[in-house]
């Protein structure tokens, strides 16, 4: 399941580093190519809220296998696309797969592992998601240079086959426990603690993705680092390190992680603004950024299992929808700021969003210990 999370989220964000070859090959603008991320995000939001309601009568194992098939079909369609419409149709399918599977993943995990192993299992599962957030763009760049952009997207097909076989072997039959309706999802927000938690996680992802997509132009133009160095640095060090230590942040008391991670990212963003012209300092700060980014989905999913242990499908659906919304809005507002006010304003925007997330997370973080 962690591998599937990694493959899905990597597929969503690989276009970040492949905009130019995609646009040149399919004869449309880089702006249109960039819409692929927003388009898949839109369908992920829709599917996370409505998809599992439509599949409410199906065994959850069957639903996961279905979403894996959809991912593989998406890879084939995107790889063979010869125009804008076909390319975006493939991107819509990957959004459906992401929204559906990701919203179910934590609820499924809680049902198939021993209660004492839930925190560790979530760290492994969401570690795949978190690692993909960091390494997908440089991985796409590396694969694009090696086998072309079509080859890069086609890698999801053999990866999907591996996931499919493994799912059939290890995931037992999981009959649906209850229907997940929009009314049920919305009712979760009546809890002040849960609502504040959702606001905090939304701001955390908005802050992250108002800055992350624009690290490449920042590093190339301000710091003077080449793209190969960027790829190796992010892929080989920051993302992997952050994933490996994600379990460290999943403690009885989640407050330090829920507040400290976004606060740390805010400090890094601020320091990049001041020291971005110094390659050594920038490299060290990016390492810290990668380490602090990857545990965020792990910690928030663990928090959710403590706050709403009996409503994880509904909670997972809402969290995925909000994260996808945050990614889209963060990238959009960061891009607008980058284009019209310059990179400094983008980094300051990210800093403000991350600080707000840290402050709002205080109360939900305190309650998580009480619920434990």
Identify the residue ranges that each predicted region occupies.
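Helix-breaking motifs and short loop linkers at transmembrane-helix boundaries and internal kinks
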Residues: 27, 59, 80-86, 275-277
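A late C-terminal transmembrane helix in Major Facilitator Superfamily
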Residues: 307-343, 349-350
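Helix-loop-helix hairpin linking two adjacent transmembrane segments in secondary transporters
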Residues: 115-169
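Cytoplasmic helix-loop-helix junction between adjacent transmembrane helices
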Residues: 90-128
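C-terminal transmembrane helical hairpin of 12-TM major facilitator-type secondary transporters
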Residues: 256-299
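Helix-to-loop junctions at the C-terminal end of transmembrane segments
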Residues: 47-59, 242-254, 338
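Paired small-residue
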Residues: 74, 85-93, 280-288
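Conserved MFS/SLC helix-loop-helix module at the cytosolic interface between two early adjacent transmembrane helices
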Residues: 46-82
